[in-house]
From Swiss-Prot:
Protein name: Carboxysome assembly protein CcmM
Organism field: Synechocystis sp. (strain ATCC 27184 / PCC 6803 / Kazusa)
Segments of skewed composition (Polar residues): 335-346
Keyword Repeat part of the UniProt annotation: yes
Notes on the domains: The N-terminus has a gamma-class carbonic anhydrase-like domain (CA), while the C-terminus has 4 repeats that are similar to the small subunit of RuBisCO (rbcS), called SSUL. The SSUL are connected by flexible linkers. The N-terminal domain forms a scaffold on which CA and other carboxysomal proteins assemble, while the C-terminus binds RuBisCO.
Lineage per the UniProt record: Bacteria, Bacillati, Cyanobacteriota, Cyanophyceae, Synechococcales
Source organism superkingdom: Bacteria
Family to which the UniProt record says this protein belongs: Belongs to the gamma-class carbonic anhydrase family.
Length: 687
C-alpha cells in the first residue's frame, strides 16, 4: 500500500513539474514576436536547456541541461553538425554586429561542425567559431573569430581578435591584441588528446532517448540501482615534496603558458664543465602529475645537480633553466627558501630571523640574491669605505660558500654586521665563463641598502630597486602599467629591449639603442629598466618587445619623457608615465574597454565622438603636425602611425601625440584603408 502511494505521488509530481516547465517557457517575455528555433530531428536538446529565437541547430548536435542559447537580440545563430554544448554554456549576441558564415550569409553567432563548447563557457556574438574547435571551461569568446582546429583552454578571454587555425590559447590567457593572437603556439598532440577525452566523456551520455522537443520534460520511469564505486583517495603530494613553493609556482606558470617541462642532471664533475644529461620530459598537462614526475627525478638523482627546463615545443627552444637540487640537498625536505621567505618583510628592512641584530638586507636585494643562486652563479662580497667608494676602489671580502638560500643570507648578514659603517656589494659570478654578471650595492654607511650599482658595474649587471613604502608603488620607479607590459611580454616568450633619444632627435624619430637586457626573470628585467631610466634621465626612453623567433618587434612603448622627474631612482609619476606608455599605437595593454585617459592632456568631447564615429565605420586613424611657419605653407609632417582599432588605445595614442607636439598644430586624419584615401582632415590642436 505504501509503495502504491509513493508511486502515485511520484507520478503526480512528475506531471506537475513538466506542466510547470511548459508554462514557464510560454510566459517568458522574450519568447514573443521571435522566430522559432529550427532544430534537426536528430539533434538532442535537453528539456532543461533554454533555446530562444532564430537558432538553427544542425544534425547530431547535443545541448546539455543548463545551457542558454538566446537569439533574442543578435540573430540568427548557426550551430553546425555534431557540435557539443555542455552544461551551463551561455550563447548570446549583440543587436548589432554580424559575422560571415561558411554559407556566405550573415550570422550573429556561427559555430562550425565538430566544435565542443565546455562547461560554463560564454560565447557572445558577433563570434565565428570554426570547425573542430574547443572552448574550455569558463572561457569567454567575445567579438572574435576563432579558426578551424583552434583550442582555447580554461578560464581564458578571447576578445576583438582573430585566432589563426590550429593555435592554442593557454589557460588563463587574455588575448585582446592581434599581435598576441599571431604569436600563439600551435596545438600539440597532447592538447588534441585532452580535447577528445572531454568531448568523448560528455558525448556518450548526451544521446537522446526520447523526442527532441525542448519543451518536453524527460524523466526516467524508474531510477537505476546505484552501483557502488570504489574511489581512489586523493593524496596531496605537495605535503612531502622536495621542491619549494617557488619552483612549484614556476612549473604551474609554465604549464599555464602551454610550455613543456623537462629536466637535466649532472654530478659535481660534470657540473663544472656544464655537461648535463637529460632526465626526460614530463608527460601530461596537470600540475600535480608534472610535480610528481619532477619529484621522482629528484629522488632518482639524489646527490646530484638537477635543473628544471621550460620548453617551447612549437619553437623548439628553451624558455627557462632553473637549478632545483644540489648535492647537499636532501630530497623530501623542503628546506630551501623557507627560512628566508618567512624572515624577509615585504615592505621593510627584511631582516633575517637568525641573523645578527645589525645585519640589514633589503627585500629586493634578497630577491636578486635568490635569483643569482637559482641560476647557478656564485656570490662574491666586496666592501669599501666612503673615501674608497668615491674612487670606485673596492676590497674583496671573499665568497659565500653555500648555495642554499637560507645559509647564504645568514652569511651575508654576518658580513654586513662586520662592515656596518662601510659600503657592501654582492657580486654575481659565472664560474664557467669566469666573469661578473651582477654588482649590487646592498648596504651603505647610513644603513640604507637600496643604492644604485657602483660606477664600475657592467651594463648587464643588476640594479638594486628601491623598496616601496607602505603606500608607494611596487617594483621601484616603474609604473604598474609598465610592469604589467613587461610581465605580459615575458609571459609570451618575448625579449625586452630599450632605446633612448633626446628632444632634438625625437622629432626626427632617431633613436639610439641601449644595452641589451638579457635574462627572462621579471625582477632582473625590471631592475635593468630602472637603471636605464636613471642613466638617461631627461631623455625619451621607450621599451621594445622583440619576437626572437620571428625576429620582429611586437611592441614600442615610451616609458619616460624629458619632463618626467626621476627622484631617488624613481621614474615619472603615474599620470605622466601613463601618457608615455600609451603613445605607441601597438601597445600591449589589455584592451578591455576601460577608461582611456589617465594623462594631463585631455581630448575634447567632439574629438572623442569623431574618433568613435570613424572607428565604427571601419576607418583608420592618423595624425599630422606642423609648426606656425610650416602651417602657413600648408606643410604637414606625419606622426607615428596608429595601427590599433580599439577606441581606448586610439584615444590614448592621440593624447600622447598631442603631448609630444605641444605648441604645434595637430590634425586628425580619417583614412579609408580599402580605397587608400582620406575621408577626414580636422585640426584638433593649435599653438
Amino acid at each position: 500500500m505504501l509503495a502504491k502511494s509513493l508511486g502515485w505521488l511520484l507520478a503526480v509530481s512528475r506531471r506537475n513539474y513538466c506542466m510547470g516547465s511548459r508554462t514557464a517557457l510560454a510566459s517568458r517575455p522574450w519568447s514573443k514576436h521571435l522566430a522559432d528555433p529550427q532544430i534537426d530531428p536528430t539533434a538532442y536538446v535537453h528539456s532543461f536547456a533554454n533555446v530562444v529565437g532564430d537558432v538553427r541547430i544542425q544534425p547530431g548536435v547535443s545541448v546539455a541541461p543548463g545551457s542558454s542559447i538566446r537569439a533574442d537580440e543578435g540573430t540568427p545563430f548557426w550551430i553546425g553538425g555534431n557540435v557539443l554544448i555542455q552544461h551551463g554554456v551561455v550563447i548570446h549576441g549583440l543587436e548589432t554586429g554580424r559575422v560571415l558564415g561558411d554559407d556566405d550569409q550573415e550570422y550573429s553567432v556561427w559555430i562550425g561542425p565538430g566544435t565542443c563548447v565546455a562547461h560554463l563557457a560564454l560565447v557572445h556574438g558577433p563570434v565565428y567559431l570554426g570547425a573542430n574547435c574547443f572552448i574550455g571551461f569558463r572561457s569567454t569568446v567575445l567579438n572574435a573569430r576563432v579558426g578551424d582546429g583552434a583550442v582555447v583552454m580554461m578560464h581564458s578571454l578571447v576578445q576583438d581578435v582573430e585566432i589563426p587555425p590550429n593555435k592554442l590559447v593557454p589557460s588563463g590567457a587574455m588575448i585582446t591584441q592581434q599581435h598576441q593572437a599571431d604569436s600563439l603556439p600551435d596545438v600539440q598532440a597532447g592538447d588534441r588528446h585532452f580535447v577528445q577525452q572531454i568531448a568523448a566523456m560528455h558525448g556518450q551520455s548526451a544521446s537522446p532517448t526520447q523526442g527532441t522537443d525542448p519543451t518536453v520534460c524527460v524523466l526516467p520511469e524508474s531510477l537505476p540501482a546505484v552501483t557502488p564505486v570504489t574511489e581512489t583517495p586523493y593524496i596531496n603530494s605537495i605535503d612531502n615534496m622536495s621542491i619549494n613553493s617557488d619552483i612549484t609556482n614556476q612549473i604551474r606558470s609554465l604549464l599555464a603558458q602551454g610550455y613543456g617541462i623537462g629536466a637535466e642532471h649532472a654530478n659535481e664533475r660534470r657540473f663544472k664543465t656544464k655537461s648535463w644529461q637529460s632526465c626526460g620530459t614530463a608527460d601530461g598537462f596537470r600540475p600535480d602529475q608534472v610535480i610528481a614526475t619532477v619529484e621522482g627525478w629528484l629522488q632518482e638523482f639524489a646527490g646530484e645537480y638537477v635543473r628544471l627546463i621550460g620548453i617551447d615545443q612549437g619553437a623548439k627552444r628553451r624558455v627557462v633553466e632553473v637549478i632545483i637540487q644540489r648535492p647537499g640537498d636532501v630530497p623530501g625536505s623542503p628546506s630551501r627558501g623557507t627560512t628566508t621567505t618567512k624572515a624577509l618583510s615585504s615592505g621593510g628592512s627584511g631582516r633575517s630571523a637568525v641573523a645578527h641584530q645589525t645585519g640589514n638586507l633589503a627585500g629586493d636585494s634578497a630577491n636578486q640574491l635568490r635569483a643569482l643562486l637559482h641560476q647557478g652563479y656564485k656570490i662574491g662580497l666586496e666592501y669599501a669605505s666612503a673615501r674608497r667608494f668615491k674612487t670606485g676602489s673596492w676590497l674583496t671580502g671573499g665568497t659565500i660558500g653555500s648555495h642554499r638560500e637560507g645559509e647564504a643570507l645568514q652569511e651575508l648578514n654576518r658580513f654586513l654586521a662586520d662592515h656596518t659603517n662601510e659600503y657592501v656589494r654582492i657580486i654575481g659570478i659565472d664560474p664557467a665563463g669566469k666573469r661578473r654578471v651582477a654588482e649590487i650595492v646592498v648596504h651603505r654607511p647610513n644603513g640604507n641598502g637600496n643604492g644604485k650599482p657602483s660606477s664600475s658595474s657592467s651594463s648587464v649587471g643588476y640594479k638594486s630597486a628601491p623598496v616601496s613604502s607602505a603606500g608607494g608603488s611596487s617594483a621601484g620607479g616603474l609604473t604598474p602599467e609598465v610592469i604589467a607590459t613587461v610581465r605580459g611580454l615575458l609571459a609570451n616568450g618575448h625579449s625586452i629591449g630599450t632605446e633612448h633619444t633626446d628632444k632634438r632627435r625625437f622629432k626626427a624619430k632617431s633613436w639610439d639603442t641601449c644595452p641589451t637586457i638579457d635574462g627572462g626573470r621579471e625582477a632582473e628585467v625590471l631592475a635593468k629598466l630602472e637603471a636605464c631610466l636613471a642613466d638617461h634621465a631627461g631623455e625619451y626612453v621607450r621599451i621594445i618587445g622583440i619576437d626572437r623567433v620571428g625576429k620582429r618587434r611586437v611592441l614600442e612603448q615610451i616609458i619616460q619623457r624629458p619632463g618626467d622627474n626621476v627622484v631617488a631612482g624613481r621614474s615619472p609619476s603615474s599620470s605622466s608615465a601613463s601618457t608615455s606608455s600609451s603613445a605607441s599605437s601597438n601597445g600591449f595593454g589589455s584592451g578591455n574597454g576601460g577608461g582611456y585617459s589617465n594623462s594631463a592632456v585631455r581630448l575634447d568631447n567632439s574629438v572623442v565622438t569623431q574618433v568613435r564615429s570613424l572607428l565604427a565605420q571601419g576607418y583608420k586613424i592618423g595624425t599630422e603636425h606642423t609648426d606656425k611657419r610650416r602651417f602657413k605653407a600648408k606643410s604637414w609632417q606625419s606622426c607615428a602611425p596608429i595601427t590599433s582599432t580599439h577606441e581606448s588605445e586610439v584615444l590614448r595614442a592621440l593624447e600622447g601625440c598631442l603631448a609630444d607636439h605641444n605648441g604645434e598644430y595637430v590634425r586628425l586624419l580619417g583614412i579609408d584603408p580599402t580605397a587608400k584615401r582620406r575621408v577626414l582632415e580636422t585640426i584638433i590642436q593649435r599653438p
